[in-house]
From Swiss-Prot:
The gene is ybeY. It comes from Pseudomonas paraeruginosa (strain DSM 24068 / PA7). The keyword Metal-binding applies. InterPro entries: MetalPrtase_cat_dom_sf_prd (IPR023091), YbeY (IPR002036), YbeY_CS (IPR020549). One of its GO terms (molecular function) is zinc ion binding. Its main location: cytoplasm. Single strand-specific metallo-endoribonuclease involved in late-stage 70S ribosome quality control and in maturation of the 3' terminus of the 16S rRNA. This is Endoribonuclease YbeY.
Length: 160
C-alpha cells in the first residue's frame, strides 16, 4: 500500500519516534486503503493548546487531534486522508502517568488518529467498542500491550 507521509516536527521533545516508525504504524492502521496521503505534525504544548482551543474549545493540550480532509464529492477517490497533530509532551506525560511504554503509547495514538481519519469514532459505547477492539488488534500485531487494560480512570484525552 503506497503511503505518502509528510512528517512535520515542530517540537523540541526528546525520544520522538523515527519517521520509519510513524510510517509503519500508519501503514498498519491504513492497510485497508490502496493509497493514503496524510500529514503528521508533532507539536509542543503551546501549539497543542492553541489548536485544541480553536477547534474543540478545550483549554488544554490534548494528545492527538485528527483533521479529516474535506474533499469535494467529485474528488472522493483521491488518497488524501487528512492531518494528525500529536502533542509530544502530552504523549510522554501520559505514558509516564499510565505506566505505559513510551513507544507503545506513540503507536497507539498514531493508530487511533489514523482510525479517526478513516471515519471511526468513540462518541457512543458501540462505536468506542468497535474502535478500541481494532486498536487492540493492531497493537497486538506490533507486540504492544492492550492500551485499555489498566483503565482505572478516564481514557487518555482523545480528539474528536
Amino acid at each position: 500500500m503506497p503511503l505518502e507521509l509528510d512528517l512535520q516536527v515542530a517540537s523540541d521533545a526528546a525520544d520522538l519516534p523515527s519517521e520509519a516508525q510513524f510510517r509503519a504504524w500508519c501503514e498498519l492502521a491504513l492497510r485497508q486503503r490502496a493509497e493514503s496521503e496524510l500529514t503528521i505534525r508533532l507539536v509542543d504544548e503551546a501549539e497543542g493548546l492553541e489548536l485544541n482551543s480553536t477547534y474543540r474549545h478545550k483549554d488544554y493540550a490534548t494528545n492527538v487531534l485528527s483533521f479529516p480532509a474535506d474533499v469535494p464529492e467529485e474528488f472522493l477517490d483521491i488518497p488524501l486522508l487528512g492531518d494528525l497533530v500529536i502533542c509530544a509532551p502530552v504523549v510522554a506525560r501520559e505514558a509516564r502517568e499510565q505506566h505505559k511504554p513510551l513507544q507503545a503509547h506513540w503507536a497507539h495514538l498514531v493508530i487511533h488518529g489514523c482510525l479517526h481519519l478513516l471515519g471511526y469514532d468513540h462518541i457512543d459505547d458501540a462505536e468506542a467498542e468497535e474502535m478500541e477492539t481494532l486498536e487492540r488488534e493492531l497493537l497486538a500485531e506490533l507486540g504492544h500491550p492492550d492500551p485499555y487494560a489498566c483503565d482505572d480512570e478516564e481514557p487518555p484525552s482523545k480528539e474528536k
